[in-house]
Amino acid sequence: IKKIIFVVILVAISISLLVIGNGYNMYKEALEQMPLSKKVASIREKENYAKIDEIPQIYKNAVISVEDHRFYKHNGIDIIAIVRAFVNDIKAMKFVEGGSTITQQLAKNIYFTQEKKITRKIAEVFMVFEIEKEYDKNQILELYLNTSYFGDGYYTVKEACKGYFNKEL
């Protein structure tokens, strides 16, 4: 029985290392195609880009409250949210809740697809560390609000304000 347990553990470790390696490669390939600084510069050059000081504080607070209430307290990964989501997904026996932070969502929005694959999630984690190393929380929030989908074809907070409320920021 000890041999079986050893083999199972060895297989689990091998699979984990393979998945992590594939995620790391996906992350590196994304950065090779366009480095983070260039990606951010291209986002900031867009016509409908809103700087953080243009966005009302009440709106920023609302987004943080709904999307990632520990945003200013973690390094881009919220272990508590991940565990909570995992437990709720297990209880429901399907994906019902996400544990992604604002930084993780930003990484996904600017580099990766929306598909639910573990390899993409691993790549996202590596990208989160890169983003958190290069940008402060307000810059991350600003980028997030300028790369998120708000529905009805609106991909920035400025577009959403104009489209939904016919108002400028």
Predicted feature locations:
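Juxtamembrane regions of bacterial inner-membrane/periplasmic proteins
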Residues: 1-169
